[in-house]
Amino acid sequence: MTTMATAAPVRASQAWYKILYVQVLIAILIGAMVGCLWPSVATNDWVKALGDGFIKLIKMVIAPIIFCTVTSGIAHIQDAKKVGCVGVKALFYFEIVSSFALLLGLAMGNLVRIGHGLAVKPDAAAVANYVKQAEASKTVDFILNIIPDSVVGAFARGDVLQVLLFAILFGFSLMALGKRGERLRGMIDDVAHAVFGVIAIVMKAAPIGAFGAMAFTVGKFGPAALGNLIGLIALFYVTAALFVVVVLGLIARLVGFSIFKFLIYIKDELLIVLGTSSSESALPQLMEKLERLGCSKPVVGLVVPTGYSFNLDGTNIYMTLATLFIAQALGVDLSFGQQLTILLVAMLTSKGASGVTGAGFITLAATLSVVNPALVPGMAIVFSIDKFMSEVRALTNIIGNGIAAVFVSWWESELDHVTLQTRLNKSTASTTIDTTST
C-alpha cells in the first residue's frame, strides 16, 4: 500500500525567530497585549479581518483535501486482498477506537464545560445566514442534500458531505479497477501533495491570523477570555493523556505489553512529531520500527498508512471537545440529539483528516459546517490557540496508529511476542542507562 507521506527531510537548525511555533507564540502574546491595552484598536474591522481571512484560507482547501485523502485511502485498500481479512479487521478497530475518542472528548466537554460563561456574541450579520439555513433544514432534506446535483457544484460550494460521498464512491471505483487504476491513483496522490503544499503556504500566514484572532477576542470579550482558552488547552491535554493511558493502555495490556514501554520505544518518532506538529512526518520511521518490534510487514504496510485517514484519535478528541467549547462560548445549548449528531458527523469528517499540520483545524471547520453552521464564526475563538493543541493531536494520532498495527498483528496471530518483549525491554533499559549516565 502506498501513502502520501514522505520522510521528513533533515534540516539544519534554524534561528529561533524563524520557527513557526515561536512566531505564532509571539503573535499570540502581542495580540493579547494589544487586546488588553488598546481594545478599540483590537476590535477594528481590519484586525478582525486578519483572523477571519486566515480561516477562509483554511476553508478553501477543505474539499480538495477530503477528496484526495479519502479517495486515496480507500483506493489503496486493494492491498488488503493480500493479507486476507486484515483490512476488515483494521477498519473495525478504527471505528471502535475512534468512537471511544469522540465519546471521551464529548464527555469531558460536558463534564468540565470550560467554555461556559464566556458569553461570546459573534457578528449577527455574519451568523444570520447560517441560522436561517439551519432553521429551514429538515431531516429528509439533510439526507437528500448529501447527494450532490453535480460533483463540480459540490466542490464549488465546498459542501463537505457531498464531497465526502463522491470521494468514497470514487475510491471504491478505483479500488475495483485494480492495476488499470494505478496511474489515476498516482495522479490523485500527486494532487494531494500539491494541496498539502498549498496548506504549507497558507500556514506561513498563521502568525498574522493568530495575532488578529487573539487581539480581537481579548479586545472584545476582555482578558477573562484568556482564562477560558488556557483552560481548553489544559482540558485537551488531560483528555488526550487519559485516552492514551486508559484506552490505548488497556488495548496494549490485552496484547501483553506496557503502553509506557511502547512510548519509550517510539520516543524518537514522538520527538519528530512534536517538532513538526504533523504525525505524518514520522510515518516511514514508525513503520520500520513496528516491523522490528515483531509486527507482520503486510499488516504494518496496510494498517499504518490507512490509519492516517481512518484512525486519528487525537483529532477525534479535539473535534468533539472544541465543538462543545465553541457552542458553550456562543451560548448555544446543544441537545442530546444534536450531540449525537456531532458524533455521527465527526465519524465521517474525521476520515478526511490527514496527518499534515493544521488538518485538525480544517476537520473542525468541516464538522461545524455540517452540525450547525451558526457555530462556524466561533472558530476564531479557538484558532489563536490551535497551534498549542496541534502537537498533542499529532502525538496522540501517531501513538494510536502504532498501537493499532500491533493489535491487528496480534489479532491476526502474526505478532512475534518474543521479539516484542525483547525490543521493548531493551529500549527501556537503554533509556534508563542514558538517563543515569547523564
From Swiss-Prot:
GO terms under biological process: L-aspartate transmembrane transport
Chain's gene name: dctA1
Topology class, membrane: Multi-pass membrane protein
Organism encoding this protein: Bradyrhizobium diazoefficiens (strain JCM 10833 / BCRC 13528 / IAM 13628 / NBRC 14792 / USDA 110)
Transmembrane region(s): 20-42, 57-77, 90-112, 160-179, 192-214, 229-251, 324-346, 361-383
Primary localization: membrane
One annotated GO molecular function: succinate transmembrane transporter activity
Family statement drawn from the similarity comment of this UniProt entry: Belongs to the dicarboxylate/amino acid:cation symporter (DAACS) (TC 2.A.23) family.
GO cellular component: plasma membrane
Protein name stated in the entry: C4-dicarboxylate transport protein 1
Pfam families per UniProt: SDF
Function statement: Responsible for the transport of dicarboxylates such as succinate, fumarate, and malate from the periplasm across the membrane.
